[in-house]
Amino acid sequence: MGIIAGIIKFIKGLIEKFTGK
């Protein structure tokens, strides 16, 4: 759960970086 949650958080961060210009 910890690793998966970390990956999801990381991907969400990248998406916000690209979408929240």
Swiss-Prot record:
Swiss-Prot/TrEMBL keywords: Cytolysis, Formylation, Virulence
The keyword Zinc-finger appears for this protein: no
Keyword Metal-binding annotated: no
InterPro entries for this protein: PSM_alpha (IPR031429)
Top-level taxon of origin: Bacteria
Entries under Pfam families matching the protein: PSMalpha
Regulation: induction: Up-regulated by agr.
BP terms from Gene Ontology: killing of cells of another organism
N-formylmethionine modification, residue list: M1
Family assignment from sequence similarity: Belongs to the phenol-soluble modulin alpha peptides family.
Main function: Peptide which can recruit, activate and subsequently lyse human neutrophils, thus eliminating the main cellular defense against infection. Stimulates the secretion of the chemotactic factor interleukin-8 (IL-8). The ensuing activation process triggers an inflammatory response in the host, thus contributing greatly to virulence. Also possesses hemolytic activity, which may contribute to the development of disease.
Other remarks in the entry: Peptide production is higher in most prevalent community-associated MRSA strains than in hospital-associated MRSA strains.
Protein name as annotated: Phenol-soluble modulin alpha 2 peptide
Species assigned in the record: Staphylococcus aureus (strain MW2)
Origin organism lineage: Bacteria, Bacillati, Bacillota, Bacilli, Bacillales
